[in-house]
Amino acid sequence: MPEILDQARTQVLENGVGLDEAGALAVLNLPDEHLPAALQLAHEVRMRWCGPEVEVEGIVSLKTGGCPEDCHFCSQSGLFTSPVRAVWLDIPSLVEAAKQTAKTGATEFCIVAAVRGPDDRLMRQLREGVAAIRAEVDIHVAASVGMLTQEQVDELVEMGVHRYNHNLETCRSYFPNVVTTHSWEERWETLRMVRASGMEVCCGGILGLGETVEQRAEFAAQLAELDPHEVPLNFLNPRPGTPLGDRPVVEGKDALRAIAAFRLAMPRTILRYAGGREITLGDLGTRSGLLGGINAVIVGNYLTTLGRPATTDLELLDDLKMPVKALSATL
């Protein structure tokens, strides 16, 4: 058994203290023959500190495309030649999407907008949409609408948004290679205000942007410092017309190493499968991740890419004897 896994068994599994950056790097560098043991330990940590339930979430785009930022992985940027163009979703369609999400047993419904940060129009639409969903659908409403001012944070709290997603995307040292129109620190400031407001913080990123293994460990440590309620893990699904459109996808075993490392760095955090798992891991790898530290999934499609049918994921959870977290358990 590698020394890092012996250390993690005592430090993380028994005492609930996450691995630091050096520990995460050691897990990320484990040879293939020790990957099953790392995943097994990560699963034991998840079961010990989070329990057996899996949180299910659906997401929908209130405003798609036309974003002024240059996030190099994103086809919604108005600066690239990708085919996504600006379009708004009407409120009845937003409510219907929430209803369909709730039918899957999901407890979370996240409203997303492709913006640097919300303007007055978006805040009005968001207020109307959140109110309509809360009146008609038994589901928690989350939001992801970019960088916020303190006034906007306060408005979201007043609306009843209980969780806010704002991904750091990658580690601080690599971020300037991925985004140049705003800084990592600006994102961190929004997250600081969200945490202070009492809303739950959802913050993760994308693996496979060109970062090194060392930078993945750096990212895990920075997320652990933030201590978010939830960490969504995406794997790059290269989008035509974007600067990263020709990047290779993450190797499945490297993705699983990352899942184990992030779980061992953050034993109590909701670790959610997000975009890209379909092409990076496939069916078998998706199962392995759920048995290796993952305890939440986004069901259905993502913002600009196709996901798996909700029934496929729900059948897998049933096969693994992993109960879907009930709404009453999240209140």
Swiss-Prot record:
Cofactor annotation comment: Binds 1 [4Fe-4S] cluster. The cluster is coordinated with 3 cysteines and an exchangeable S-adenosyl-L-methionine.
EC number: 2.8.1.6
Reaction(s) the record says it catalyses: (4R,5S)-dethiobiotin + (sulfur carrier)-SH + 2 reduced [2Fe-2S]-[ferredoxin] + 2 S-adenosyl-L-methionine = (sulfur carrier)-H + biotin + 2 5'-deoxyadenosine + 2 L-methionine + 2 oxidized [2Fe-2S]-[ferredoxin]
Binding site for [2Fe-2S] cluster: 110, 202, 272
Pathway: Cofactor biosynthesis; biotin biosynthesis; biotin from 7,8-diaminononanoate: step 2/2
Bridged cysteine pairs (disulfide): none
Domain Radical SAM core: 52-277
Known partners and oligomeric status: Homodimer.
Family: Belongs to the radical SAM superfamily. Biotin synthase family.
NCBIfam families hit by this protein: bioB
Role description: Catalyzes the conversion of dethiobiotin (DTB) to biotin by the insertion of a sulfur atom into dethiobiotin via a radical-based mechanism.
Protein name as catalogued: Biotin synthase
Encoding gene per record: bioB
